[in-house]
Amino acid sequence: MSSYLALVIGAILGSSFRYFITLLNFTILGLPAATILVNIIGSALAGYFLNRFNGALYIFVYIGFFGSFTTLSSFNMELFSLVSDKSFVKALIYFSLNIFISFLFFYLFHMISIRFEN
């Protein structure tokens, strides 16, 4: 499979999964939860599969799928909306959940993958 084809197929799948989760249209504590959920799932999977792929498969999984599944642009748009509405506490919670929890899941699932490898 060519690198370009791997990228395109991964991006189609990643954006499709993201769109499906967005259609669930739910909130947690009044915050847009779809982006938080996508970032946590994407971070967990990216951490789990870290350094497992190369070549076209890496392009398919990391650049194509994860690149289109987890998007910082949606996060920034929703964070900006909260700040613009002067919902500073919600904005701080939203920022923290996306950044810290996503990183925590990335790290934890990477450690889990190492345990399974050994």
Predicted regions and their residues:
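Membrane-interface helix-loop junctions in multi-pass transporters/channels
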Residues: 1-118
